[in-house]
A protein has these predicted regions:
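Active-site beta-loop-alpha junctions enriched in small/polar residues
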Residues: 9-11, 36-38, 66-68, 93-95, ...
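Short, charged, surface-exposed secondary-structure boundary motifs
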Residues: 41-43, 169, 224-230
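Alpha/beta enzyme core
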Residues: 77-88, 92-97, 102, 113-188
Length: 309
């Protein structure tokens, strides 16, 4: 069994969700924040609220940043260090056009000179242990060959590799042949990320790449929140146990939404994403009722039907 990391997903894995998952399920060595970015002269208030220590008690949290160059990088690091954090993850893998057009995320993989400048800045912050999340490249799957030697000069905690290129976004297949080449050359602890959905997926990657230092799941863990505990215990849960723990998570998430939002319609809008990725294990009819409910009353009726299954 390898340490399991929870990848961030914008709009889903904010502090309340992370805390609820850690409290009810666990099995995760590190939870990563959705990337924090420089925008309109500073950091968005909601991003700073998301990393406040009091909002993340009991959660092994790693703030993740995305930057196009040293100015943004240093601004973000300062803001995060002021909150007491000594771990920061640099996102060099995001494929979202809104970020890559600014030279951030996976676009950095085609600009090794900027990566080198960022690396120099990392060495100026000895109190922070950095990690890097990246892809094979931006436009070509061998662009990592120009970046990895730069990263080898740093005392990184680890590198997380998602074996696609940026312009693929999440389409097509992961390139496992090129991942193996990276795996064989990487001298840092290496974490695998990409298309991990099931316990069998985790076991397969662990078996094929035994020297990995960890595995990272994002959408797969959102869709099967209990899989981290199943993986840690080596035992697949019964369906009823899965349902019960997810309903406990849901109750806490509902309470959070009710405290934050006034109207039932606002609560309903915010709570539905909790289920969005979970259609693989929930009965199709129930899932549809949860997602299509037009009123809070109908939504709670669907929850009751689910709990009675």
């Amino acid at each position: 069994m390898k340490p399991l990391h929870f990848a961030p997903l914008q709009g889903y894995t904010q502090h309340a969700y992370r805390s609820i998952h850690a409290r009810h399920i666990g099995g995760v060595c590190s939870y990563y924040t959705p990337f924090i970015r420089y925008e309109k002269g500073g950091v968005r208030r909601k991003d700073m609220v998301d990393i406040l220590p009091e909002n993340n008690e009991g959660v092994p949290l790693v703030p993740q940043i995305i930057a196009s160059g040293t100015d943004e990088f240093n601004y973000l690091c300062e803001a995060i260090q002021e909150k007491g954090y000594k771990r920061i993850d640099l996102n060099m893998g995001c494929p979202a056009p809104m970020q890559t057009k600014l030279g951030r995320g996976s676009a950095l993989l085609s600009a090794p000179q900027i990566v080198e400048e960022l690396a120099r800045q990392m060495t100026q912050r000895p109190d922070v242990r950095f990690s890097v999340k990246m892809r094979l490249g931006w436009k070509q799957p061998d662009e990592w060959r120009h970046v990895l030697p730069i990263l080898h000069e740093l005392p990184l905690a680890h590198i997380t590799m998602h074996p696609r290129i940026g312009i693929q976004q999440y389409k097509g297949e992961v390139d496992m042949e090129m991942f193996r080449a990276f795996y064989e050359e990487c001298r840092h602890p290496l974490v695998y990320n990409g298309d991990l959905q099931t316990l069998d997926d985790l076991a397969r990657i662990e078996s094929e790449f035994p020297q990995l230092s960890g595995l990272m799941m994002g959408r797969g863990l959102l869709g099967n929140p209990f899989i981290s505990a199943e993986y840690a215990s080596g035992t697949e849960w019964h369906w009823a146990d899965r349902r019960d723990v997810v309903l406990r998570m849901h109750d806490d998430w509902l309470q959070f939404c009710r405290q934050k939002y006034v109207s039932d319609s606002q609560v309903l809008l915010q709570i539905k994403p909790f289920w969005e990725y979970q259609k693989t294990w929930i009965e199709k009819k129930i899932y549809k009722q949860l997602m299509k409910s037009g009123s809070f009353r109908n939504y709670m009726t669907a929850i009751q039907r689910f709990s009675n299954q």
